[in-house]
């Protein structure tokens, strides 16, 4: 606590009431005492490092102006400017000079230097890089790139020669069919001379002669197989002996309705329904009456094939009776 002044000191410092001039001089010579808040605000710059974000802003505004001789280390700015926002910069790592990706790109750059000029400029700019990332290319890298280019060129030539040698004659386009044309008779003087060197067309024609023979053989074989298949389906897959015993004329497809005529069938099956007309044969009217008109073609053919199969079995086993088709 602050001690109060005594009465004697007050009497000495207080001027007399009659001398007003002395009182005015005393007031001018001795300034008024500052309060604790004002003294703290005046000495604030000595103890506070920064005034940003302080809670005593209004106190600094009401501060008493100081003497011109007083200097502060950290003067208070009149206008508080916002601090710039610091952004984190992400630095990209430069590619390693011995990276496999760079090696492949360098090889492509060496190969295609004459093909694409714009790409060449871009690749040069990429490999040169900035001033900080410039790195001298070692002679070993250059030597490896040259060796790789030489090996790749040799491999390309080797593959091309192998493909040309291994290309079969069948890959050539088929020759146009040769049409025999009768050439007019020319006199002996106008007859063209036979060239010494044979042209490529003649060579191809001579090479394709064997192929033409094979095509003729295939066509003959195909026609034979087709005839055999037609015979098989015409006689319902029966053996030639069965067909001969039943009669080939009974398998003719003259009309849509299959009406086989059984005239030459002679079997020891007297109890069957066909034995009644074994002398005169099966009449067409009776067969048409047996086969209804509403029966489909597939069902009718299936019944006939089943009946023929039964006939074959009856021939193999004479004891079995021959039944009429359903």
Swiss-Prot record:
<keyword id="KW-0597">Phosphoprotein</keyword>
<comment type="similarity">
    <text>Belongs to the FAM110 family.</text>
</comment>
<dbReference type="GO" id="GO:0005938">
    <property type="term" value="C:cell cortex"/>
</dbReference>
<comment type="function">
    <text>May play a role in microtubule organization. May play a role in cell spreading and cell migration of epithelial cells; the function may involve the AKT1 signaling pathway.</text>
</comment>
<dbReference type="GO" id="GO:0005813">
    <property type="term" value="C:centrosome"/>
</dbReference>
<keyword id="KW-0539">Nucleus</keyword>
<feature type="modified residue" description="Phosphoserine">
    <location>
        <position position="255"/>
    </location>
</feature>
<feature type="region of interest" description="Disordered">
    <location>
        <begin position="51"/>
        <end position="80"/>
    </location>
</feature>
<dbReference type="GO" id="GO:0005634">
    <property type="term" value="C:nucleus"/>
</dbReference>
<comment type="subunit">
    <text>Interacts with AKT1; the interaction is transient and follows AKT1 activation. Interacts with PPP2CA and alpha-tubulin.</text>
</comment>
<dbReference type="GO" id="GO:0051897">
    <property type="term" value="P:positive regulation of phosphatidylinositol 3-kinase/protein kinase B signal transduction"/>
</dbReference>
<keyword id="KW-0206">Cytoskeleton</keyword>
<feature type="compositionally biased region" description="Polar residues">
    <location>
        <begin position="209"/>
        <end position="221"/>
    </location>
</feature>
<feature type="region of interest" description="Disordered">
    <location>
        <begin position="1"/>
        <end position="37"/>
    </location>
</feature>
<dbReference type="Pfam" id="PF14160">
    <property type="entry name" value="FAM110_C"/>
</dbReference>
<dbReference type="GO" id="GO:0005874">
    <property type="term" value="C:microtubule"/>
</dbReference>
<feature type="region of interest" description="Disordered">
    <location>
        <begin position="201"/>
        <end position="221"/>
    </location>
</feature>
<protein>
    <recommendedName>
        <fullName>Protein FAM110C</fullName>
    </recommendedName>
</protein>
<dbReference type="GO" id="GO:0043014">
    <property type="term" value="F:alpha-tubulin binding"/>
</dbReference>
<dbReference type="GO" id="GO:0000922">
    <property type="term" value="C:spindle pole"/>
</dbReference>
<dbReference type="InterPro" id="IPR025740">
    <property type="entry name" value="FAM110"/>
</dbReference>
<keyword id="KW-0493">Microtubule</keyword>
<dbReference type="GO" id="GO:0030335">
    <property type="term" value="P:positive regulation of cell migration"/>
</dbReference>
<dbReference type="InterPro" id="IPR025741">
    <property type="entry name" value="FAM110_C"/>
</dbReference>
<dbReference type="GO" id="GO:0060491">
    <property type="term" value="P:regulation of cell projection assembly"/>
</dbReference>
<keyword id="KW-0963">Cytoplasm</keyword>
């Amino acid at each position: 606590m602050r001690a109060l002044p005594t009465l004697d000191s007050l009497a000495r410092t207080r001027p007399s009431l009659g001398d007003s001039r002395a009182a005015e001089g005393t007031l001018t010579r001795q300034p008024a005492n500052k309060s604790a808040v004002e003294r703290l605000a005046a000495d604030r710059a000595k103890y506070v490092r920064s005034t940003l974000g302080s809670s005593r802003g209004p106190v600094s505004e009401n501060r008493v102006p100081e003497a011109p001789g007083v200097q502060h280390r950290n003067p208070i700015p009149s206008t508080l400017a916002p601090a710039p926002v610091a952004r984190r910069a992400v630095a990209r790592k430069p590619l390693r000079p011995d990276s496999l990706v760079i090696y492949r790109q360098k090889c492509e750059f060496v190969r295609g230097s004459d093909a694409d000029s714009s790409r060449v400029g871009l690749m040069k700019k990429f490999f040169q890089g900035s001033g900080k990332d410039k790195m001298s290319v070692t002679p070993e890298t250059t030597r490896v790139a040259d060796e790789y280019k030489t090996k790749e060129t040799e491999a390309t030539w080797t593959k091309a020669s192998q493909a040309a040698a291994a290309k079969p004659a069948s890959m050539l386009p088929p020759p146009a069919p040769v049409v025999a044309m009768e050439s007019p008779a020319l006199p002996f003087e106008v007859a063209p001379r036979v060239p010494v060197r044979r042209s490529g067309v003649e060579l191809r024609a001579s090479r394709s002669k064997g192929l033409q023979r094979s095509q003729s053989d295939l066509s003959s074989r195909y026609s034979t197989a087709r005839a055999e298949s037609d015979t098989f389906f015409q006689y319902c897959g029966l053996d030639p002996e069965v067909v001969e015993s039943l009669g080939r004329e009974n398998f003719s497809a003259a009309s849509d309705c299959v009406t086989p005529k059984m005239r030459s069938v002679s079997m020891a099956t007297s109890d069957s329904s066909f034995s009644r007309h074994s002398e005169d044969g099966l009449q067409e009217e009776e067969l048409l009456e047996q086969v209804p008109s509403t029966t489909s073609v597939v069902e009718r053919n299936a019944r006939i094939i089943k009946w023929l199969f039964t006939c074959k079995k009856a021939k193999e086993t004479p004891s079995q009776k021959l039944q009429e088709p359903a």
